[in-house]
């Protein structure tokens, strides 16, 4: 049996231990993580309509997006996240990572409702600055990121994220392009405080001939028992980006805040 298969079995066992069904669940969420490459497909055609169609097919409440331009010369001063938000009737939250061609380049979150608050946290990235975008909602917290290509920077990012997660008394869901596969030192480090709740069988890059699983959705272990994952899959068959989206549906455990 390969190391990857052994790790996958271990992940599933860990998930079964931490992610349990609540007796009564009162809120269901569709969550997507997608590196959209500004709507540039694997065929190098810039067609944001394909991205919109892919996302619309998932009926998402939350979308975590990576590789977004904001009014750059490269994208003819278009606000890509805003266009996606308008087309999907969602609220945009943008976090710039770097200045680029008279604009910004970074990550974003789309949400059906406006967040209570948002926070941008810098992360290490020696080849390119990285960031963490945190959005608070009444019953949960969403964090979107795009890790550095450098393993050392990935490892340095994890304690920063753990510190942010520890501040919340509700589920902290982390999603993004982590630029690392299973197994790796980065995943091993994340597994100490988080549980992977997205699928781990289907590679997510490149979209035409997927070979690498580098996109994930996770939850902090402290609150993992407060959700139930009812569906987890990769959205295959799309060439709208060089990545394949990760999709999950979760049920949030019933509590006083959401059961009123």
Regions found by a protein language model. Give the residues of each.
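Structured beta-strand-rich core segments of catalytic domains in phosphoester-bond hydrolases
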Residues: 43-44, 52, 68-140, 226-236
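Extracellular/periplasmic catalytic domains that process cell-envelope and extracellular macromolecules
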Residues: 25-26, 57, 85-86, 101-102, ...
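Repetitive helical segments and hydrophobic/amphipathic motifs
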Residues: 13-14
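Metal-dependent phosphoester-hydrolase catalytic domains
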Residues: 120-122, 151-155, 163-173, 179-260
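N-terminal, active-site-proximal structural segment of metallo-dependent hydrolase catalytic domains
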Residues: 2-7, 17-87, 99-101, 159, ...
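Sec-exported extracytoplasmic/periplasmic mature domains
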Residues: 56-60, 85-89, 93, 115, ...
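Active-site beta-strand/loop signature of hydrolases that rely on acidic residues for catalysis
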Residues: 29-36, 51-75, 142-145, 161-187, ...
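Active-site-proximal beta-strand elements of phosphoester/diester hydrolases
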Residues: 28-40, 119, 134, 139-148
């Amino acid at each position: 049996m390969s190391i990857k298969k052994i790790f996958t079995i271990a992940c599933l066992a860990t998930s079964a231990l931490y992610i349990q069904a609540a007796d009564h669940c009162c809120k269901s969420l569709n969550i997507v993580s997608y590196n959209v490459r500004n709507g540039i497909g694997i065929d190098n055609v810039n067609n944001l309509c394909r991205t919109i169609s892919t996302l619309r097919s998932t009926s998402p409440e939350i979308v975590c997006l990576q590789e977004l331009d904001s009014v750059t010369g490269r994208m003819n001063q278009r606000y890509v996240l805003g266009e996606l938000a308008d087309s999907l009737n969602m609220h945009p939250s943008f976090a710039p990572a770097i200045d680029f061609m008279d604009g910004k380049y970074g990550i974003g979150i789309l949400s059906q409702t406006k967040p209570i608050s948002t926070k941008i946290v810098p992360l290490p990235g020696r080849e390119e600055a990285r960031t963490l975008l945190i959005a608070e909602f009444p019953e949960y917290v969403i964090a979107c990121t795009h890790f550095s290509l450098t393993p050392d920077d990935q490892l340095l990012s994890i304690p920063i994220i753990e510190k942010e997660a520890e501040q919340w008394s509700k589920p902290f869901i982390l999603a993004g392009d982590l630029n690392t596969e299973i197994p790796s030192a980065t995943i091993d480090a994340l597994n100490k405080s988080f549980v992977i709740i997205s699928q781990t069988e289907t590679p997510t890059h490149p979209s035409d001939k997927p070979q690498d699983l580098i996109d994930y959705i996770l939850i902090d272990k402290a609150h993992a028992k407060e959700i139930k994952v009812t569906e987890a899959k990769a959205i295959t068959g799309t060439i709208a980006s060089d990545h394949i989206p990760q999709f999950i549906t979760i049920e949030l455990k019933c509590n006083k805040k959401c059961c009123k």
